[in-house]
């Protein structure tokens, strides 16, 4: 996703997928049973209904700062728009979309800028669900089970399922020796032995299920679907993607309360203080913040 959006100079070559993982809801087992999500196909509309009823809250990374959050967000939009061939700029202005996606994102009770950090945050306790990579739901469950705690049940929203691809590409700077070293590394990572080791970490290496010897990692009692044939949604163009992310940042996401603690001690005199002020200007001056999708929404509170 970000590789495609960021390679504006078309310098990346030899890109090949090393692993993939769907972005799913991991819901506390007991709650998933209560919601009727166990052993059945679940839609984004079903998830929205659970959020609207106050029965489901979840942790999710920021769509503007993390691939898992962005992938989930695009999947939500895709489903709420009725599964179009592709999301367009006009699609984003569809009547009712703003209200629905805002209601869905109102269920986010904690956020993070990283998928791994989100998993670590979730494991501190006190949360019912998280949206994350399937491989990190598996990892979280391995730790929860080792602690003797309730595990998560994986829910795959069938009408808005995003697949996170992990391609490895070479940034071409004209160095043929480095390019060959890259190709050797890529060949190693794509070898059968290493692909099997990657699959043992809970990451898939293809769209048509997992190998028999690794099924013990992809446990069906956790809701993991090792035999599911993954059909990824079609991602929008880079321009539409950025438009959607700006709407997420300024209109759709749950407003945040942010408290900044700034160090004005003597040790910050001179360059340190100048750099701190410059950093804050990149966040608080909205024209600057927009360049990195950090702008505030109308109802946000900054202290």
Language-model segments: residues:
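Periplasmic-binding protein-like
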Residues: 13-25, 95-104, 112, 147-174, 188-210, ...
